Amino acid sequence: MKFTLLGFGLSNKEIFKYLVKNGHEVFVSEGKKLASSDKKLLLENGVQFEENGHTEKALECDIILVSPGVHFENEIIKEAKRRSIEIDTEISFCQREFEKIGWTPFVIAVTGSVGKSTTVSLIYHLLNKKVRALLAGNIGIPIAKLLNDNLRANYLVLEISSFQLFWSKRFKPNISSILNIYPNHLNWHPDMEHYVSSKFKIASFQSKDDVFVYNPNDEYIRKNLYKVSAKKVPFRFDFSIEKLPIHLRYRQTVENVAAAKTILETMGYEFKWEFLEDFEKLPHRMEYVTEINGVKFFNDSKATNAIAVIRAIENFDDKLHLIMAGIGKNEDYTLLAKIIKEKVKILALVGPIADEIEPYLDGVRYFKVDTINQAVNQLFSMASRGDVIMLSPGGASFDAFKNFEERGEYFKQLVMQLKEGNCEEC
């Protein structure tokens, strides 16, 4: 069988290794320039490829496996559909491959606009108190890596994005969950209906024997429950924020824990609050960095949309200084601007997002700079003892960084460098 890999990102690289190892013919078509290391890998394996665009050569195959970020209006995809060429992506392709090798783990799949990585990490952590589980998906561990590394367990926890779901052919988890739905990725999805439909694809192929665990407080989810055939179980918000360990005591974590707790109990396992004590919080999500002369610094680089920034701001009073940065996602910033006006002392804007949000900032005290470094230094010079300076960008990182992790690490390095030169109480 001949495969075309449309896009050569993290997931398709792992699929490439799997396909070559199993003797399949592969062609790689990358819309951007391939890294020299990727070219070397392809040449060493005798695999033909093209870069800086897709040609009709990509159509000379039986199946096209699409990298999640490839746009749905891609001309090669349109032509492939006209020619009835099969189109799939990692999550459903790998699930079929699991079945072929006789591995049928109990699959828990989670999607949502914010909080996915924290929630799947919590589920993975809680399950491993009782059984052995694996974690993969959009959290940064390609599902195909489980095939390549021969990793097996009875339970598989997956973080799934709207892009992955859009391209998936037939993905059927035992338990699916949608945490929340807010306007997001509208620079990729043409409208909210398209985005919501992609999210609900997580439950499209579930039967009445499967389970759909959902947030009952989310209007988009409630309005679309009729699409779900699986047994519907709402999150159980039967606890207060004070129940959470100190290191997890943030408002957005309540939703994450409610989802994980409900899923664990739905599976028949006991949940104990003590299980959360040794859960290591993921970096770049409301991550406390340090304190300098009474000013606290938080790194929330993972906040790449408006609602994530709103949730971060809600954890503080009116002594907050906020840094927003990166590339916006074609969002309506009305609500975010209202919250900023109420709770943020000074807003620093860095990069392209400034032009998107500026029309909403009437009455907000803000300034624009070219770099996060300038924002940190300027805000620190204006901050008073008891204030907080937080990076919660609200935009993608690709204008200046490889990913949100690199951006967060850079911010932390800037803060620690600032501490070395300014700390009066160290």
From Swiss-Prot:
Disulphide bridges, residue numbers: none
EC number: 6.3.2.9
BP GO annotations: cell division; cell wall organization; peptidoglycan biosynthetic process; regulation of cell shape
Enzyme type, top EC level: ligase
GO cellular component: cytoplasm
Catalytically driven reaction(s): UDP-N-acetyl-alpha-D-muramoyl-L-alanine + D-glutamate + ATP = UDP-N-acetyl-alpha-D-muramoyl-L-alanyl-D-glutamate + ADP + phosphate + H(+)
Binding site for ATP: 112-118
Pathway(s) per entry: Cell wall biogenesis; peptidoglycan biosynthesis
GO molecular function list: ATP binding; UDP-N-acetylmuramoylalanine-D-glutamate ligase activity
Pfam families in the record: Mur_ligase_C, Mur_ligase_M, MurD_N
Annotated keywords: ATP-binding, Cell cycle, Cell division, Cell shape, Cell wall biogenesis/degradation, Cytoplasm, Ligase, Nucleotide-binding, Peptidoglycan synthesis
Principal location listed in the UniProt entry: cytoplasm
Gene3D superfamilies, sorted: Mur ligase, C-terminal domain (3.90.190.20), Mur-like, catalytic domain (3.40.1190.10), NAD(P)-binding Rossmann-like Domain (3.40.50.720)
Domain of life: Bacteria
Localization: Cytoplasm
SUPFAM superfamilies the UniProt entry points to: MurCD N-terminal domain, MurD-like peptide ligases, catalytic domain, MurD-like peptide ligases, peptide-binding domain
Keyword Mitochondrion: no
Cited InterPro entries: Mur-like_cat_sf (IPR036565), Mur_ligase_C (IPR004101), Mur_ligase_C_dom_sf (IPR036615), Mur_ligase_cen (IPR013221), MurD (IPR005762)
HAMAP family tied to this protein: MurD
Annotated family: Belongs to the MurCDEF family.
Free-text function comment from the UniProt entry: Cell wall formation. Catalyzes the addition of glutamate to the nucleotide precursor UDP-N-acetylmuramoyl-L-alanine (UMA).
Descriptive protein name: UDP-N-acetylmuramoylalanine--D-glutamate ligase
